[in-house]
Structures are given as C-alpha cells and as structure tokens.
Design a protein with these regions (language model features):
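Structural motif
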Residues: 57, 76-78, 85, 101, ...
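Short acidic-glycine-tyrosine-enriched beta hairpin
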Residues: 84-98
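A short, N-terminal "cap"/entry segment at the start of jelly-roll beta-barrel domains
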Residues: 5, 15-51, 59, 129-132
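Short, conserved beta-strand element in jelly-roll/cupin
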Residues: 53-55, 64-79, 117
Length: 132
C-alpha cells in the first residue's frame, strides 16, 4: 500500500510541476537589444514556447521539421508566409506549416512582441535562412 501511495504522490508532483503559468504582461526583454530578443518560456519534447521582441525585421527563414504558431501581443507590421504578405497587428495569430518560408518587417515604433510556439521541441538545428 505504501508503494501505491508513494507512486501516486510522485505522479501528482510530476503533473503539478510540469505546468507553467506566465503573465504575458510581465514578459520584458532581459537586456537592451539591437533587433531581436528571444526568451525561452518553456520547452519539452513536444513543443517549445518563446517570447520574442523584434524592432526591425526577421529575415525570411523556414523550420524544416517544425510548425510554428506566432501570436502578436504588441506592435504591427507585414508578415510574409510563403509567397503571401499580410498586414498584422496585436491579436493576430499566424500559423506557419513546417518547411515554409516566413519573415516579418515591423512598422510600429515600439518593438513587435510575440509568443512563438514551435512543435516539436525547437533546438535551432532545422532553421534555414533564405539567401538574399
């Protein structure tokens, strides 16, 4: 019986410890930056979540093995996905299939702040930048 109770407690501790709650309003760049600042919020084998601030642009690139969901918290600009360009602003969600070229040009005075969720876990190994 002790074994069952111990296993149950360990299971509950693991579940509770695996959850993360962050206030989006409290996320701020950790230091001064020229163009892009990235903060990892959470990661496991299934996905990685980042807070990203962009002052000017993110060059066209793709993730060979990852899908990416980008939710705009602040700012606006032009987001290109494949051959289409969209005007984007606070509250927009961009869904980017794996192996799809994408990038953004910021037009707001304040940096664009986004939440980026990539699946599976992002380790930076499959990001390919498009040559100019």
């Amino acid at each position: 019986m002790k074994t069952i109770i111990t296993l149950a407690l360990l299971f509950l501790i693991n579940i509770v410890g695996a959850q993360t709650i962050k206030s989006i309003d409290d996320l701020e760049p950790s230091e001064a930056f020229d163009n892009i600042q990235v903060q990892k919020i959470d990661s496991d084998s299934l996905s990685t979540t980042f807070a990203i601030w962009v002052k000017l642009k993110v060059k066209m690139h793709k993730h060979v093995n990852h899908i990416e969901n980008v939710y705009i918290i602040e700012g606006n600009g032009e987001f290109t996905v494949s051959d289409s360009t969209y005007k984007v602003r606070k509250g927009d969600l961009i869904v980017i299939p794996k192996d799809t070229w994408h990038g953004v040009k910021v037009s707001s005075k304040k940096p664009m702040k986004v939440i980026s969720i990539q699946s599976p876990e992002f380790k930076g190994l499959d990001r390919v930048f498009k040559e100019d």
